[in-house]
Amino acid sequence: MQEEKQGLPMQIRKPRSFEDVEEIINCFKQKMTVIVYVNELNNSTALRVVDILSGAIYALGGGMAELERDMYIFNPDGVTAK
């Protein structure tokens, strides 16, 4: 059983293009929780961004959830949003 970690850093990101995805994935690698707003992207780009980020966080053992329309939270392995 994994212990829940508290007090980890959090980032809030608003990607403006698909090219911003790599920077967000680097936050995942540093075990940061990241809230991502995709409301400034067109629908097809927003879908691509969320698909790539969800695959990346899954590959790193973390998880994600939709908080509201166009807002997602990505948690590293061992961190649960409350």
Question: Locations of the language-model features?
Answer:
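N-terminal leader/presequence segments that are low-structure
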Residues: M1-I12
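Conserved, well-folded catalytic cores of nucleic-acid-processing
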Residues: E3-E4, C27, K31, I52-L60
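Conserved beta-strand segments of the P-loop GTPase G domain that flank and frequently precede/overlap
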Residues: I12-P15, V36-N39, N75
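Helical mechanochemical/support elements of P-loop NTPase systems and associated helical scaffolds
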Residues: S17-I24, N42-V49, A56
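Short capping/connector residues at structural and topological boundaries
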Residues: E23-N26, Y72
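Short glycine-rich, basic-tinged beta-strand/loop micro-motifs
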Residues: F28-E40
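Residue-level "edge-of-site" marker
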Residues: E40-L41, D70
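Short basic, glycine-rich beta-strand/loop surfaces that mediate nucleic-acid
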Residues: V49-G61, A65-K82
